[in-house]
Amino acid sequence: LAKHARSMTDHGFDFDYLHLDEDVFNELSFRDRDGHAVRMVEARTFNVTADAEHDSACGSWFELSLPVKDTVGAAQFWAPVAQTLLQMREEPTMHMRFDATRVPLGLSESIALKAPSLCFRNGDRKGLMALVEQRGFEIEKYPGYEGAFVAIKAPEGTTLFVFEEDFLGESYEVDESGDISDFPS
């Protein structure tokens, strides 16, 4: 994190909090260009147990989604820590996913995304819905964000969107040649 902090400083990041030292978990916080408070804490320095590698009850986490007004501008802001574009979609709303040091960071112009949120893939819709009902979590079915089948409100207020599959799907190329023979009759 100390190395990233130096790079971020070189790129004009203005930290609200910065604590870097040899014998502590390095930590920093700042606000992004859309006003979201971001806090980064040094990664663990121990090996995780095999049990901890399993998916959560929500399924497999695949993205931290941030609502942005201008995806390209936000991408420029995040470039010092998220240099690799993983996937991009322009329609129906612009959405870019970057590798932010092994954290998939999504930047979305979707009006349905109100705050930073976590996205999960879960093929067991019935099982998950039974679990959230049993636990009494606050949910919204079909919340309108990228085809999620449910939005679960965590106790501290974070929204967890759950999808049957990754909404950006597999990469594909669009043929824009205009040649009608490209389309079967």
Positions of PLM-derived features:
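Vicinal oxygen chelate
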Residues: 1-34, 68-73, 117-159, 163-165
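Glycine-rich loops and low-complexity Gly/Arg-rich segments
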Residues: 19-20, 41-43, 64-67, 88-92, ...
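Core segments of cupin and vicinal oxygen chelate
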Residues: 20-26, 58-59, 65-103, 134
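Short helix-to-loop capping/linker segments positioned immediately adjacent to catalytic or ligand/cofactor-binding
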Residues: 17, 50-52, 85
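Short, well-ordered, mixed-charge alpha-helical segments that flank or form enzyme active sites
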Residues: 25, 37, 47-49
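A short alpha-helix capping/helix-coil boundary motif
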Residues: 11, 53-55, 106-109
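N-terminal beta-strand motif that seeds the catalytic metal site of vicinal oxygen chelate
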Residues: 41-76, 80-81, 113-118, 166-185
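Conserved short beta-strand elements that form part of the metal-binding/catalytic scaffold
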Residues: 31, 37-45, 83-122, 144, ...
